[in-house]
Amino acid sequence: RYEYDTRINRICGMCNLENYDTTYDYLFSSAGSGPGFATWKRVANLWDDTYSFLNNEYDMHKFQAKYNTLDDKRYHETCKAHQAEGKAHWETIYSYACQLNSQLVIIPTRNLVHNNGIGVANSTHSDLTLDQVLPQLRQLTYQPSYELSFPIKHPLFILEDVEYMQKRLHVMGRDSRTHRKYVKIKSLIWRIRH
């Protein structure tokens, strides 16, 4: 359905809210999670592994005016560091391609992914044990997964679900400066105790 629609960047399998109450089986968001996603070659063709977009002063000015939170500024600095080291990092080239092209991500309204990569011996992506993970994030990582039911109920319009994004940012502790600090302090205390 969206293979040739350049407004769509990828299809995610993970819903950070486990279940999100809406009329449809999926929604559109400006960001999604990495576990269990699919994309198309047309999206990979937008990736700039030399980070040359950082040298485009005019477009970077527009970009930074739109994405101007503290997290956005830190991510931009991370991107510059990746450019300086001369090594492409998938996360940054992928994210920037999506944002620079104003693309949206498809998110299922029920989580379809069961992630068992944290707290497992010889894990590929994490050396943390389960007791080192903040309970709030553990809940996010180990939430139940559900089967997709057919026929799929498609949204009528391609429009970002801003309410979903706000709830997602809250769950991740990134919705406000105060909440971000609270989550960081809680995480630090948790790690000291464990």
Predicted regions and their residues:
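Peripheral/terminal regions associated with large enzymatic or DNA-binding modules
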Residues: 1-194
